[in-house]
Swiss-Prot record:
Keywords linked to the UniProt accession: ATP-binding, Hydrolase, Nucleotide-binding
Entry protein name: 5-oxoprolinase subunit A
Catalytic reaction equation(s): 5-oxo-L-proline + ATP + 2 H2O = L-glutamate + ADP + phosphate + H(+)
Molecular function in Gene Ontology: 5-oxoprolinase (ATP-hydrolyzing) activity; ATP binding
Pfam families, sorted: LamB_YcsF
Biological processes, Gene Ontology terms: carbohydrate metabolic process
Enzyme Commission number(s): 3.5.2.9
Domain of life: Bacteria
Subunit structure as annotated in this protein's UniProt entry: Forms a complex composed of PxpA, PxpB and PxpC.
Species the sequence originates in: Mycobacterium marinum (strain ATCC BAA-535 / M)
Length: 252
């Protein structure tokens, strides 16, 4: 039976401000991309999410990002590569301590937001993120976009790369994501998103906004936990994938 992992961004609340339903999402996904306090999240909230993930057997991933709480890590920052190495090491280390205190561990690393998109093509920042992961633990897989410069840099350093696809994001014909600033970048219809996920897994292709069929490789599918109706969307995706004969399990 073919398998696919489901991942979502969690732990992105801050104090009394909550973003999404982390507890409900942890009952659906197999991998949790947990914020590390730079783009979102605060210690008490991250501890709660990691504890809940550990109790449910959900893998914990360090979701590293730019130091940009005000912009939620969705703004490009022209950070010096040496500084970026240090910041990524810091974030992984912080979440690793929290995860270990809950009887779990950080199992992988996934960049967030603008950093994720930037290192698809930005060689210096891609190299910095890959170097930081290797410095912390060279056995940690990195989750990201196939064909990216980041994956090239990670592979050169001997890191395992795990490709993901986005069920609820629009794609360009070059295989990159449509900017969130553009209309229609984030999809909202749960049934359509679920069918799209099944189609991507079965065909290895995704339909771009211009109708182009773009080849895509994936071991994991991302379902965003902060979108309206996120729990319903994630549930529909999991149910449809299972009904189509796919086993839902973590990639690591």
């Amino acid at each position: 039976m073919p398998y696919i992992d489901l991942n979502a961004d969690l732990g992105e609340g801050f104090g009394i401000w909550q973003l999404g339903d982390d507890d409900a999402m942890l009952g659906i996904v197999t991998s949790a991309n947990v914020a590390c306090g730079f783009h979102a999240g605060e210690p008490a909230g991250l501890l709660r999410v990691c504890r809940a993930a550990a109790e449910r057997g959900v893998r914990i991933g360090a979701q590293v990002g730019y130091r940009d709480l005000a912009g939620f890590g969705r703004r490009f920052i022209d950070v010096d590569p040496e500084d970026l190495v240090a910041e990524v090491v810091y974030q992984i280390g912080a979440l690793q301590a929290i995860a270990q205190s809950c009887g779990s561990t950080v199992s992988y690393v996934k960049p967030h937001g603008a950093l994720y998109n930037t290192i698809v093509t930005h060689r210096d920042q891609a190299a910095a993120v890959a170097e930081a992961v290797q410095m912390v633990d060279a056995t940690l897989p990195v989750l990201g976009m196939t064909g990216s410069v980041f994956f090239q840099q990670a592979t050169d350093l001997g890191l395992r790369t795990v490709a993901e696809a986005f069920a609820d994001r629009a794609y360009r014909s070059d295989g990159q994501l449509v900017s969130r600033r553009e209309h229609g970048a984030v999809l909202a219809d749960a049934a359509a998103i679920a069918q799209r996920a099944v189609s991507m897994v079965a065909s290895g292709k995704v339909t771009a906004v211009d109708g182009t069929q773009v080849p895509i490789t994936m071991e994991s599918i991302c379902v965003h936990g902060d979108s309206p109706g996120a729990v319903q969307i994630a549930t529909a995706v999991r149910d449809r994938l299972t009904a189509a004969g796919n086993e839902i399990r973590a990639f690591c």
